[in-house]
Design a protein with these regions (language model features):
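General beta-strand structural signal in soluble alpha/beta enzymes
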Residues: 53-55, 72-74, 98, 126-132
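Short hydrophobic/aromatic-enriched beta-strand-loop microsegments
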Residues: 51-52, 68-79, 148
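Mid-chain, well-packed structural core segment of small domains
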Residues: 78-117
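Short active-site oxyanion
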Residues: 24, 45-52, 122-124
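Short, glycine-/small-residue-rich phosphate/pyrophosphate-handling segment
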Residues: 131-150
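Short, solvent-exposed amphipathic alpha-helical segments in soluble enzyme
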Residues: 39-45, 112-114
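Short internal beta-strands
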Residues: 49-58, 62
Length: 150
């Protein structure tokens, strides 16, 4: 039964970007940055398999604390979330890892909601916490999509 499901998924979903490696956008609210650094440090070798795009301070942390190569856009409150949403629409992002702090207010909440909506509209995998981020970067489907894109 699982093989039927996997075959069905592969026929309907593919990597959005035409890059050799999947492109992963990473964003973290301030209250979740420490969790992201711990997650990224633990999963460094796996994350190195992706081309990473990140918002300002998140990108700095991933580069400086974890040692990952990162393409940075501006910070989230200054339009970075919208820049990433635009890249999703353009087909330049294959998955989004957005460590959301649900207990804090965010003045740029409309931008955040735009990104979340665009991921759903474009059928882009979206992880909003550590548990789903782990599932996302471990997905055998992403590995199969990667092989199919080659």
């Amino acid at each position: 039964m699982l093989s039927k499901y996997r075959g069905s998924m592969l026929s309907h979903v593919k990597l959005a970007s035409n890059h050799e490696r999947p492109r992963l956008a990473i964003i973290a609210h301030d209250g979740k940055k420490a969790d992201l650094v711990a997650f990224a440090t633990f999963n460094r070798s796996r994350l190195q398999e992706y081309d990473i795009i990140a918002t300002g301070a998140t990108g700095d942390l991933l580069r400086d604390k974890v040692g990952l190569d990162v393409e940075r856009v501006t910070s989230g409150p200054h339009g970075g979330d919208v820049q990433i949403a635009s890249r999703v629409v353009e087909g330049d992002v294959d998955a989004v890892l957005f460590m959301v702090d649900p207990l804090d207010k965010h003045p740029h909440d409309p931008d955040i909601q735009t990104l979340l909506r665009i991921c759903n509209v474009c059928n882009i995998p979206l992880a909003t916490n550590i548990a789903t981020a782990d599932v996302l970067i471990s997905s055998p489907l992403l590995l199969e999509f990667r092989a199919a894109a080659s």
